[in-house]
From Swiss-Prot:
Enzyme Commission number(s) from the entry: 2.8.1.8
GO cellular component, one term: cytoplasm
Binding site for [4Fe-4S] cluster 1: C37, C42, C48, S275
Keyword terms of this UniProt record: 4Fe-4S, Cytoplasm, Iron, Iron-sulfur, Metal-binding, S-adenosyl-L-methionine, Transferase
Note on cofactor: Binds 2 [4Fe-4S] clusters per subunit. One cluster is coordinated with 3 cysteines and an exchangeable S-adenosyl-L-methionine.
Organismal lineage: Bacteria, Pseudomonadati, Bacteroidota, Bacteroidia, Bacteroidales
SUPFAM superfamilies tied to this protein: Radical SAM enzymes
Protein name, per record: Lipoyl synthase
Binding site residues for [4Fe-4S] cluster 2: C63, C67, C70
Sequence similarity: Belongs to the radical SAM superfamily. Lipoyl synthase family.
Subcellular location: Cytoplasm
Predominant location category: cytoplasm
PANTHER family linked: LIPOYL SYNTHASE (PTHR10949), LIPOYL SYNTHASE, MITOCHONDRIAL (PTHR10949:SF0)
Length: 282
């Protein structure tokens, strides 16, 4: 079985531990914040935290959905922490970030699916951090474009929403979300003309190259200009197993194909994640 195959050398990483890593950890924990770095068991956490960067996760640490690739806790979330937007903004200031990335759990339990909390967070980041550029990685808000408009009007510099996987695998990989709803969200962002629309996908779940290229074409047709492609890694036994480890050479091939197809920016390598080197995606 694929899950018993030894992890290849190119996926073995050194966990960070310098002074900047410790400082970042202290700031995050001191403000009682959540990051996708820890909840998602991101392989780049050592590198990013050692550079003083982190991807903040708002809305709490419990998601209302149960996507089979994701390690974030799922269940009934706690009430929103109204101080969270300010805590995130202050942490960005303390870290001295020039570019910040914020994502969230899905909050399908709320009437607005968390959109108002998103807007408050963006506004607080802008108020406290003059000159900082901001990327937001948003949920699909169940296809409610009026809620997507709230995020657009708050004016982050980049709005990202991940397709995650190819059309065929979406029902077995993602929870509640659909491929076409995600495309519609991306199209709506791009059509606003106010900021780049960005998406990301994982490889190694059993997709074919033909399906990957179809996703690229669908994303481009929706107006997406930035795409990230990385290797899926099984975060725990309850998650989907890895079907295949994609080689660095295959990732580079896809990067070149994506450039030829017309993406303005494409990151494609085994350890690439949506927010990895996000400052390049403005």
């Amino acid at each position: 079985m694929a899950q018993h195959v030894k992890k290849p050398e190119w996926l073995k990483i050194r966990l960070g531990g310098n002074e900047k890593f410790t400082e970042t950890k202290s700031i995050v924990e001191g403000h009682c914040l959540h990051t996708i770095c820890t909840s998602g068991k991101c392989p780049n956490m050592g590198e990013c935290w050692s550079r003083g960067t982190a991807t903040f996760m708002i809305g709490g640490d419990i998601c209302t959905r149960a996507c089979r690739f994701c390690n974030t806790l799922t269940g009934r979330p706690k009430p929103l922490n109204e101080a969270e937007p300010t805590h995130v903004a202050l942490s960005i200031k303390l870290m001295g970030l020039n570019h910040a990335v914020v994502t969230s759990v899905d909050r399908d339990d709320l009437p607005d699916y968390g959109a108002t909390h998103w807007v408050k967070t963006i506004q607080e980041i802008r108020r406290i951090n003059s000159g900082v550029t901001l990327e937001v990685l948003i949920p699909d808000f169940k296809g409610r474009m009026d809620l997507v408009d709230m995020i657009i009007e708050a004016s982050p510099d980049v709005i990202s929403h991940n397709l995650e996987t190819v059309r065929r695998l979406t029902p077995s990989v993602r929870s509640v979300a659909t491929y076409d709803t995600s495309l519609a969200v991306l199209r709506h962002i791009a059509q606003s003309g106010k900021m780049p629309a960005k998406t990301g996908m994982m490889l190694g779940l059993g997709e074919t190259e033909e399906e990957i290229l179809e996703l690229m074409d669908d994303a481009l047709a929706a107006g997406v200009s930035v795409i990230t492609i990385g290797q899926y890694l099984q975060p725990s036994r309850k998650n989907l197993p890895v079907v295949e480890y994609i080689t660095p050479e295959q990732f580079e091939h896809l990067r070149l194909v994506g450039i030829e197809k017309g993406f303005r920016t494409i990151e494609s390598a085994p350890l690439v994640r949506s927010s990895y080197h996000a400052e390049r995606h403005l």
